[in-house]
Design a protein with these regions (language model features):
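ATP/NTP-dependent adenylation/nucleotidyl-transfer catalytic domains that generate, transfer
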Residues: 1-36, 50, 58-61, 67-68, ...
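Short, surface-exposed alpha-helical segments at coil->helix boundaries
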Residues: 44-48, 73-77
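Primarily recognizes the serine-hydrolase "nucleophile elbow" in alpha/beta-hydrolase
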Residues: 53
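His/acidic metal-ligating clusters that form di-metal
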Residues: 126
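Conserved G/P- and acidic residue-centered "switch" motifs that form tight phosphate/ATP-binding loops
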Residues: 41
Length: 264
């Protein structure tokens, strides 16, 4: 298994990411803006800060997307004010309700609103649709804010928060993202905010059944968790969810594959 060690000098990592972001925009739209959903958590805050430092604050747009009344949306607003970037707010509450209600009279199964798989994943996909709508109108590129820890155990929604045009943090564990955030001078209240699922009131770690500290030690060093049940939980989640981060399998034609020649 590959591990995810970070440089002894975190500034080496920071400069690497900023240069990578700059190069991405040179190659994929020098006039484009970075469009990022701001939740008030560490990942979106750190990713947005890196984009601001790489591109300038005038080329970064933050989007708040509460679902109805959201108790922690004020923290997201504070992040936007801290970054001094242009922001928009789109409340997805009514969009979600309309989406669920569209199944009421035509769907031959249980009440969609009571299906936890639907209600936990649909808002993330709707938020991503909002980001791409804004990106389409403003000539932007959508920032993916997932980290390596979440990706390894599949703690994301396929085509939801796992989507995006470029992903500056996907090779960094939660531990590394926090270290980057502190080194960037981001206020601790944004970095230390415990991530929640936004539905049950539980933290991510409550839902996972282990801490990111244990997971990150495993990912960064390869040292197995002392508790075998935790290790088994981690690996079962990895095997069950790896499809979320792998490219979509494709059936290639018999004979020469023309897609292989698309790279000019």
């Amino acid at each position: 298994m590959r591990t995810y060690p970070i440089a002894d000098d975190i500034n080496i990592e920071i400069n690497h990411i900023k240069n990578w972001i700059k190069d991405y925009f040179v190659q994929n739209g020098p006039d484009c803006k970075a469009i990022i959903g701001l939740s008030g958590g560490k990942d979106s805050t750190v990713a947005a800060k890196l984009c601001v430092e790489a591109l300038g604050k005038d080329k970064v747009i933050g989007v708040y997307m509460p679902q109805g009344k959201q108790h922690d949306i004020d923290i997201a607003h504070e992040v936007g004010q801290y970054l001094q970037i242009q922001t928009f707010e789109v409340n997805i509450g009514k969009i979600c309700d309309t989406f669920y209600e569209s199944f009421d009279n035509s769907f031959p199964f249980d009440n969609v609103k009571e299906n936890s798989v639907v209600t936990s994943n649909s808002p993330a996909r709707i938020r991503m649709s909002v980001l791409y709508a804004i990106a389409g109108m403003l000539h932007g590129r959508v920032v993916n804010t997932c980290n390596a820890s979440e990706d390894f155990v599949g703690y994301s929604t396929k085509f939801g928060d796992s989507a995006g045009d470029f992903s500056p943090l996907s090779d960094y564990t939660v531990h590394a993202v926090k270290a980057i955030g502190y080194a960037l001078g981001i206020p601790a209240k944004f970095i230390d905010k415990a991530p929640e699922d936004g539905l049950s009131g539980k933290t991510d770690e409550d839902n996972l059944g282990f801490t990111y500290g244990v997971l990150d030690t495993f990912l960064e060093t390869g040292v197995l968790p002392e508790d075998y049940e935790v290790y088994k939980n981690i690996m079962e989640r990895y095997k069950r969810n790896i499809h979320k981060v792998k490219p979509m399998p494709m059936c290639y034609r018999v004979g020469p594959c023309h897609r292989e020649n698309w790279e000019l």
